[in-house]
Amino acid sequence: MELYTALLAVTILCLTSTMGVSGDCSTNISPKQGLDKAKYFSGKWYVTHFLDKDPQVTDQYCSSFTPRESDGTVKEALYHYNANKKTSFYNIGEGKLESSGLQYTAKYKTVDKKKAVLKEADEKNSYTLTVLEADDSSALVHICLREGSKDLGDLYTVLTHQKDAEPSAKVKSAVTQAGLQLSQFVGTKDLGCQYDDQFTSL
């Protein structure tokens, strides 16, 4: 079974990488109602903090991604950097936005930095991303990873539009409201992150 990265995820948050979780996803996760979707589907996001609820490996990852939505279809360009091995990998994802709010289930192709497809999406693997909070500068998202009909566990990520920026007071409050503490999260600021901003510019 493939293990899943802790950084998507942005999302992210790639179904072909090496950081994973196992166990059922939380069943009481729903998108925050009334959120302006433009707050999330605008600009580039950097994962500054992540919480893997059941980690299996110790490699640390950096990630950035750009989500866009048009007529209910979400498309994302994701970049991941393994801070331990100094390696990069790239994905293009696509999914459908749920009618209930800022929540979508996506599948991903593995591509190179020029976006040429290296591996088509595995139809049995997906993740559902739920936006718990978002404002002009930062966001909190929950991700449920799946292989077929089996949940592989919960992943929370804090996103900001600026590299190494702290989340807003509103997003910090959302972390607390989710029953979590930001101190539980792994911060990416000191990992020596590298990014490919050209790739993530849709």
UniProtKB/Swiss-Prot annotation:
It is found in: Secreted. CDD domains: lipocalin_NP2. One of its GO terms (biological process) is vasodilation. Heme binds at H80. Changing K44A: Slightly reduces anticoagulant activity. Pfam families: Nitrophorin (PF02087). Disulfide bonds join C25-C144, C62-C193. Belongs to the calycin superfamily. Nitrophorin family. Heme-based protein that deliver nitric oxide gas (NO) to the victim while feeding, resulting in vasodilation and inhibition of platelet aggregation. Reversibly binds nitric oxide (NO). Also binds tightly to histamine, which is released by the host to induce wound healing. Exhibits anticoagulant activity. Inhibits interaction of activated host coagulation factor IXa (F9) with phospholipids. Inhibits factor IXa (F9)-catalyzed activation of factor X (F10) in the presence of calcium and phospholipids irrespective of the presence or absence of factor VIIIa (F8). Interacts with human and rat coagulation factor IX (F9) (inactive and activated) in the presence of Ca(2+). This is Nitrophorin-2. It comes from Rhodnius prolixus (Triatomid bug).
